[in-house]
Amino acid sequence: MTRVLLAEDEPLLREILVEGLVDEGFEVQAAVDGLEALVLYRAQRPFDALLLDEEMPGLTGRQLLRLLRGEGDRVAAVIFSGNLVLEAGEQAGLGIGPVLRKPVSMRELCAALHAAIAAAKRPPGP
């Protein structure tokens, strides 16, 4: 089963996402913010993918990824936000899969997770 760590600070949205992802066959661990996600990630790895809200208290999705990438971790990652725009260089540099704009459909979310997981399994380029 594909393990996903979800970090979303809005309780209702977090609950909806967990239920939807579980219904789609994912095993989901949920965190209320970026700091809790970091603690859960380190304690319960391996995860196949991270699904991160960009705008959270503590650590943003990008800040969390910078920490993990700095430790050499290449876990698949999808960021979603109501208003985030990333430059292609920053997105590639952090190894972020698709960046999704809220609201997002479960179909789009699942497709993004599968794409990010497949990309993370490929060997890094030169």
Describe each region flagged by the PLM:
Residues 56:
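Receiver (REC) domain active-site loop signature in two-component systems and cognate sites
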